[in-house]
Amino acid sequence: MAREVKLTKAGYERLMKQLEQERERLQEATKILQELMESSDDYDDSGLEAAKQEKARIEARIDSLEDVLSRAVILEEGTGEVIGLGSVVELEDPATGERLSVQVVSPAEASVLENPMKISDASPMGKALLGHRVGDVLSLDTPKGKKEFRVVAIHGR
């Protein structure tokens, strides 16, 4: 049996949008490939080969997204009392007062490019956050070594 993939509602919607975009890209790539095949006298043409590879990459991405979405279980809204999958957490460095906001998500949703950063529950930081409450102080491994953070706020999923 395939393992379920836990997603926030927003994460599920984002992946559905990506799937739509990839399907549109596939249609365009197929059209370009057909045009190249019709106009090419030499089937060893590097442009034709590149188009085939791009189409294959898009198909693989579609397969991957469809697989994740077919196994998706959308998380219910949390209470905000305990950090769990989908929680948005505000952390503060007690030494500097610097604040950091992250959301704990499944590996399928993880992205450091978003705000708040989406941290995988399977990552060291994600594992360290799970189960904590407001006021807890925890030690996290960062690229600059161990750092302490205090949980300032937890917002539900």
Curated annotation (Swiss-Prot):
Q: Which family does it belong to?
A: Belongs to the GreA/GreB family.
Question: Species name for this entry?
Answer: Thermus aquaticus
The UniProt keyword set, sorted, is: Coiled coil, Transcription, Transcription regulation
Q: Highest taxon of the source? A: Bacteria
Single GO term (MF): DNA binding
Domain comment? Inhibitory activity is regulated via a pH-induced conformational change of the structure. At pH above 7, Gfh1 is in an inactive flipped orientation that prevents binding to RNAP. At lower pH, Gfh1 switches to an active orientation, which enables binding to RNAP and inhibitory activity.
Its lineage reads: Bacteria, Thermotogati, Deinococcota, Deinococci, Thermales
Q: How does it assemble?
A: Interacts with RNAP.
Q: Which residues form a coiled coil?
A: 1-74
Protein's name in the database: Transcription inhibitor protein Gfh1
Q: Which gene produces this protein?
A: gfh1
Which InterPro entries does the protein's record reference?
Answer: GreA/GreB_C_sf, TF_GreA/GreB_CS, Tscrpt_elong_fac_GreA/B_C, Tscrpt_elong_fac_GreA/B_fam, Tscrpt_elong_fac_GreA/B_N, Tscrpt_elong_fac_GreA/B_N_sf
User: Single Gene Ontology BP term?
Assistant: DNA-templated transcription elongation
Role of this protein: Inhibits all catalytic activities of RNA polymerase (RNAP) by partially occluding its substrate-binding site and preventing NTP binding.
